[in-house]
Amino acid sequence: MACPEHTDIPAEVRSRARGCMLGQLAGDSLGSLVEFQTKEQIRAEYPGGVRLLADGGPFDLIAGQPTDDSEMALAMARGLASLGRYCAMQTGKAYRSWLDSAPFDCGVTIRNALNGAPNPTSQANGALMRVSPLGIFGAGRKRADVMAWAKKDAALTHVHPVCGQANALFAALLAHAIREGATGAELYETLLGWMKRMKLEPALREAVERAAHEKPRDCQSQMGWVLIALQNALWQMLHAPSFEEGVVDTVMQGGDTDTNAAIAGALLGAIHGEEAMPAQWREAILNCRPELGNPRVRTPRPEYCWPVDALELVDKMLEKGWKP
C-alpha cells in the first residue's frame, strides 16, 4: 500500500523520484538481456534496438527481474524507507545478507570487500550502480549530507577515491534533478559549478568534462569501469532525445550493459519522470515476481529482491527524507 502523500511534496517531485527508481530498474533489466556482448553482436541480434523487457539473457531472468545492481539498490532503499536515515552499518549488514542469499551474479570487488578483503585499486562501477536510492531520499536534504552518505556507501565495497567521488557527485545530481526539475543542460552546469569547489581525481574530472561532447568510445575493453558508466550517463543526460532512447542507446553500446543502463536510466528518469517510462517496461517491473515454484522462473530470488513494491518504496523514502 502506498505511503500517504506528504502535502509538501509536489506531484512533479514524486514523479521524478519514481522515474529515478523505475529508470534504474528498467535499464538494469533491459541491459541484462545482452550483458557482456559487443555492440556489433547486439546490433546483429537487435537491428532496431533492444526495446522490450523480456525473459532471457545470460542469467535466464524473467522480464523486469533485477540483477545484482538493482537488488543491492533495493536493499539500500528498504533500509532508507524503514529507518528514515542512511546508516552505513545497517546498510553494510543488508549487503552482507544479500551476498549470503547466493545471488546469481556479484562483482568481484563487491564480493571480496563484503568478505573482508577490499581492493584499494579497483575503480569498478558496483557502488555507483546502487546509489540511486540516496538521490531519492536526499531530494529534500542538504547536498553536503547526500554527498557524505554516498561516499560512505561506496566505501563499504569500493574504497578508491574515484568511486567515492563519483558516488557523491551522482547522488547529489539525482537529488537536485528530482527536487528542482532542471533540464539536462542546467544540471550539467550545476555539476560543473560544484566541481569547481571540490578536490577531485583528475580522471573523474576529465570524464565529466568529456561527457559534454562525446559518449565513451569503448565500453568493451574496460568493461565495468565506473567512469565509463558516469560519462555515458551524463552524455545521455545532455544528448538523448528521450528517456527511452537514452536507455536503449546505452544498451546498444555493449559491455556492462545492465549496469551502464541502470545508472543512465536512474538519471534520465530523475529528469523526465515516471510518465516517460514505456508502459511495457513499467508493467514488467511492477509485476515481476521471480518466485520459487513458478515454472516460468529459472532464477528464483528472495522476495526482498523483487521490484513489485518499487513505487511504494520511493514514496516512503520521500516521506522520510523530505525536509523542505
PLM regions and their residue ranges:
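Structured, active/binding-site neighborhoods that engage oxygen-rich ligands
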Residues: 1-324
